[in-house]
């Protein structure tokens, strides 16, 4: 990374966890990601979900077609399939052969937005997981239990004990990405796990703790899943992200929702951060005194874990304050982005 006091130039990053939606909403938000990132792992939780390789290929075409002309050829969507109780080993073989599917996403049924079709019992997926292990197809995990008896702030910690640890014992060769980790326990799990286990960390979980949900009143635009945690957990995530450990890397989990779905009696979970994602990460690393480790976290660790080449082009950020918009277009509606109306310290050059 080449940097001065007022400019950072480094290898173009990738986003290893992104929600793009579809149709006009996708056309609205896709440029924010494509300007900053060369590639992104695209989440499959559409309505209906992306459960076959054929559907993933069609979705990929829609994404590429939605890129504005000035960004054409600059962004590559990396596709995923939504794991269900009925996903077959044959579908995993097709996914691997396609060259476009980079992972299979495990959503415990009901764990987050559009997860109703998710896995009800991981034991039902044994043959499929065996095929994934055989073909070295990564399993991307939303790591929360959905047991109503478990406190919402403990869902990730309990998932490690009840689901993830037994899963890795049963499938010792399975490659797993523990997505959007939020707890000290998850950090420690990855640090002590074999090299086949990695984790993504979001910008919002690095910047916010659970107080942000209630500052001056209820803050629905800070509601996400996994939910924000205590400050001790944010500090653990910050230390992990800036440590240089090769199995922690960037995944924004940027998730656009219209204002009406957030400001609701039963609001949706999700934070939109794609409008300033790499700028937010730079700010976090600068505050931690670890700007020298930003490039590895954002641009090297992810492709290295997935077995993909690192990007060869570069981006620059300049130290310039700019105001984040109060609202962003989302198709025919509006969304409120992370830190709406506030000022960011770094700006995309």
UniProtKB/Swiss-Prot annotation:
- Report which superkingdom the organism of origin falls in: Bacteria
Chain positions found as N6-carboxylysine = 105
**Record-linked CDD domains:** DHOase
Q: Gene3D superfamilies given for it?
A: Metal-dependent hydrolases
What UniProt keywords are attached to this protein's entry? Hydrolase, Metal-binding, Pyrimidine biosynthesis, Zinc
Which Gene Ontology cellular component annotation is one that this UniProt entry carries? Answer: cytosol
UniProt: Zn(2+) 1 binding residues: 17, 19, 105, 253
- Top EC category: hydrolase
Q: Under which pathway is this protein filed?
A: Pyrimidine metabolism; UMP biosynthesis via de novo pathway; (S)-dihydroorotate from bicarbonate: step 3/3
| Residues given in the record as Zn(2+) 2 binding sites | 105, 142, 180
Q: Which GO terms describe its molecular function?
A: dihydroorotase activity; zinc ion binding
**Keyword hit for Zinc:** yes
How are cofactors bound according to the entry's free-text note?
Binds 2 Zn(2+) ions per subunit.
The cofactor(s) it depends on are: Zn(2+)
The residues the record assigns to binding substrate are 19-21, 45, 142, 225, 257, 269
What Enzyme Commission number(s) apply to this enzyme?
A: 3.5.2.3
Under the heading InterPro entries, the entry gives: Amidohydro-rel (IPR006680), DHOdimr (IPR004721), Dihydroorotase_CS (IPR002195), Metal_Hydrolase (IPR032466)
User: Which chemical reaction does it catalyze?
Assistant: (S)-dihydroorotate + H2O = N-carbamoyl-L-aspartate + H(+)
Give an example GO biological process. Answer: 'de novo' UMP biosynthetic process
Residue numbers annotated as active site:
253
Supply the NCBIfam families for this chain. Answer: pyrC_dimer
Listed under subunit, the entry gives:
Homodimer.
UniProt similarity note: Belongs to the metallo-dependent hydrolases superfamily. DHOase family. Class II DHOase subfamily.
Q: What does this protein do?
A: Catalyzes the reversible cyclization of carbamoyl aspartate to dihydroorotate.
UniProt protein name:
Dihydroorotase
* Biological source species: Nitrosomonas europaea (strain ATCC 19718 / CIP 103999 / KCTC 2705 / NBRC 14298)
Upper taxonomic classification of the species? Bacteria, Pseudomonadati, Pseudomonadota, Betaproteobacteria, Nitrosomonadales
Q: Which gene encodes it?
A: pyrC
